[in-house]
Amino acid sequence: MNKPLLSPQRPVDCPCGGAAPAARPGAATEAPRFAQCCGRYIDGGEAAPRALELMRSRYSAYVLGATDYLRATWDPRTCPADLDVDPTAPDAPRWLGLQIKAFAESDADHATVEFIARYKVGGRAHRLHELSRFLRGDDGRWRYVDGDVNEEQALIK
């Protein structure tokens, strides 16, 4: 059986650090493989089944600089025209981890995900704490709409 080859820009372990949707509760807590976790949405064209998986895949897309995926999963009414994510830029954040705090579906087409994303820029550690809102479109795909952001900054010693 041939194994799929990952492109040089794709990690083996998933940047989101979360459990792949098929993972069993109580299973070993090692990072899931990118191809089975967020890669199937970012590279495989599969639609995220819930806003939670979409949130995780969007975090991974920021880590990897997958701007096209971010645009495709952002509600066109709120997506910034100048969205461009380049993780190799000198002032780009270096993403350190994602923690999901809460996930709720208010109905079949509306959901929220509260998360904390840790990153560094210029020697300073940051925590992006956001309550994100998601909407399922007429095509059945979840999209990020907007969020309430609380950003904290701490000097690395």
Give residue ranges: language-model regions:
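Short beta-strand edge/turn micro-motifs at domain boundaries
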Residues: 129-157
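Surface-exposed, charged secondary-structure patches
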Residues: 90-127
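Cysteine-rich micro-motifs
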Residues: 31-41
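Short Fe-S-cluster ligation motifs
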Residues: 60-75
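Short, aromatic-enriched amphipathic alpha-helices that serve as compact interaction elements
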Residues: 49-63
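A short, polar/proline- and glycine-enriched secondary-structure boundary/capping micro-motif
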Residues: 48, 123-125, 153-157
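Short solvent-exposed beta->alpha transition segments
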Residues: 72-100
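Short Cys/His-rich zinc-binding micro-motifs
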Residues: 2-3, 8-31
